[in-house]
């Protein structure tokens, strides 16, 4: 399909639950003999979406891997590629339906070697309307506990999983192996931003059976409606100013913790923000957040080298907002260890990051890197030189033509360019006896000869590289 309309086709196919391979030209046109080399650079699937155009602001694309273990047990590992957190859990097979309801995956991975009974159970859950996830079978050898543990340690850059209380979850490790292998395969690269692991245990969460979730209409009505204007608890509570906030609220509703201290911390933070009069700092903070960019998704796309220039500009503005938000929260003098205290610290922008983005990018860059017009002047001397050559090409050719006419005495000499033969100096047949020794023949025509000089060849190399 045409590259400029690929997003439209992707959206239609992903909505149907299909996976799409993106193939790009990787060979050099100038040196290629025959068709230019192409390769699959990325596979877009329902559970590994990172494109803003394909994702709802208030929903996550979650990839879940399920490992059928012995003794009627299951290992679970799931990930939102834009969040960068691997979640691990283990459960009994008869609890699997509740876990899938809680996780709400967009895509589910399972082993091609699972038993027919277990496969029937998984497919039955989907048929029964327990989610709209797509189903993908992976080779059995990918569900290897040892491989999963090694991959998790590589992501965390750690020697042990004990610090995350994840060292003894061999069934979940097997699921994590398939999960990370599949995620890396679809993105066409490693996942450097995946640097956290979170273990979820059923006894740490409030037990909400699937029937209870449906009747409470947490995120979906009994009729199956889940739009933002549907009469669900999430739609009622969601007054968040950003998509990041809405997604966090939804995860809190789907996985409410038993720990009373967590609820108390959230209530304390709410009380501080509203103040005694009910009109505290929260209103100014909400105003500051209005129109904020989706930093979570932009940073993930940056790590995956999929980010677009205008997203980096949005990130630049978001970092400025984050700094202002941090100052506002610190002005409330939150106690260390509290939720607000942690938020004030986390919102402090990385040193020099915003400064680099301001210095490196134009105020209004092109939509795509290949279109040029992204990097600001003054950042790179070589780029400035190439950009100057591209801008002043006509002036250089006119100047060279004037100088060569004076040097050779050929009054009708012309310096020109075409896409087939590049830059050249054209001399008519009647003036060939005046051609200097440093002219090298490039093309012979019926009534003229075309030449190139060392100076023009050097300019040609720079001009063509400037276009690239």
What are these regions (language model features)?
Residues 1-274, 278, 283, 287-303, ...:
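Charged catalytic and DNA/RNA-contacting regions of genome-maintenance
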Residues 65, 412-416, 424:
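Short, surface-exposed charged micro-motifs
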Residues 112, 417, 428-429:
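Active-site proximal loops enriched in glycine and acidic residues that flank catalytic Cys/His/Asp
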Residues 263-270, 431, 435-449:
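Short, charged amphipathic alpha-helical segments flanked by flexible coils
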Residues 354, 360, 424-439:
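Cytosolic, long alpha-helical scaffolding segments
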Residues 395-415:
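Flexible, glycine/threonine-enriched loop-and-boundary segments that flank and lead into catalytic domains
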Residues 445, 449-468:
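Extended, charged coiled-coil "arm/hinge" scaffolds of SMC/Rad50-like chromosome-maintenance ATPases
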